[in-house]
Amino acid sequence: MPRRLWPFGQTKTSADEQALSEQIDPHRIPKHIAIIMDGNGRWAKRRGLPRVAGHRAGVESLRRVLEVCEDYNIAYLTVYAFSTENWKRPADEVNALFDLLVEYLHRELNTLHSKGVRIRAIGKIEDLPGGPRRELEKAIAKTANNTRLVLNVALNYGGRFEIVEAVKSIARLAAEGKVNPDQIDEKYMSQYLYTADVPDPDLLIRPSGELRLSNFLLWQSAYTEIWVTPTLWPDFGRKEMVQAIVDYQGRDRRFGGVKV
């Protein structure tokens, strides 16, 4: 079991997790893990609680996931916090989500910064409410030079929108004669995505049992290994995170090719 150098919380290691951790090959750790944080509403409904209670419980799951990222030297973690479609939810729920973002940054930023976490945002951040946007921008600026772990928070993010915006940027350059269309390939296209300086995810985790990408990292996930669990996000803990890594290491990643 790896030694936790800087715990975000005081989560205890279960016997199940310890048994799983013994199966992990430290030389085959995924560099980039992405997570669709799904199931907060259902978790709250099953307990007769308001939906915001599920979102609040989900914040603690993120804390546990960050612990595991530290333990196993994960370099990049990208979490789907708020999609471009989430604006369709009731206004009180949307407001509560952004209040939770501000609360989380106020409570955790100094700890994250002192431990070398760099916070980044991907999505149409300029359209976020003023207060949360400013707090997020402060966190991004404060942690900009950190290198221990990059935490990408997808806010007001949509995979299709991201691709369309990248295409529009390249089309403008082509119209101005600044790029030859024959120069445009996958690598060139990737430079115009929100994740331009981030490697594609090796592993995408989907709690709640849903079998869809939900418009998340569509371009980047072409060869990503996907791991789905019926566990709802607020119940997602260290054991589930370690299980995902173990299962990932059991996959044969071919990237479209065949071994001969």
Swiss-Prot record:
CDD domains: Cis_IPPS. Its EC number is 2.5.1.-. The active site is at D38, N86 (proton acceptor). It comes from the Bacteria. InterPro entries: UPP_synth-like, UPP_synth-like_CS, UPP_synth-like_sf. It holds the Pfam family Prenyltransf. Mg(2+) binds at D38, E225. Transmembrane segments: none annotated. One of its GO terms (molecular function) is magnesium ion binding. PROSITE patterns: UPP_SYNTHASE (PS01066). One of its GO terms (biological process) is polyprenol biosynthetic process. Keywords: Magnesium, Metal-binding, Transferase. Binds 2 magnesium ions per subunit. Substrate binds at residues 39-43, 51, 55, 83-85, 87, 89, 206, 212-214. Its cofactor is Mg(2+). Catalyzes the condensation of isopentenyl diphosphate (IPP) with allylic pyrophosphates generating different type of terpenoids. Homodimer. Belongs to the UPP synthase family. This is Isoprenyl transferase. It comes from Heliobacterium mobile. The gene is uppS.
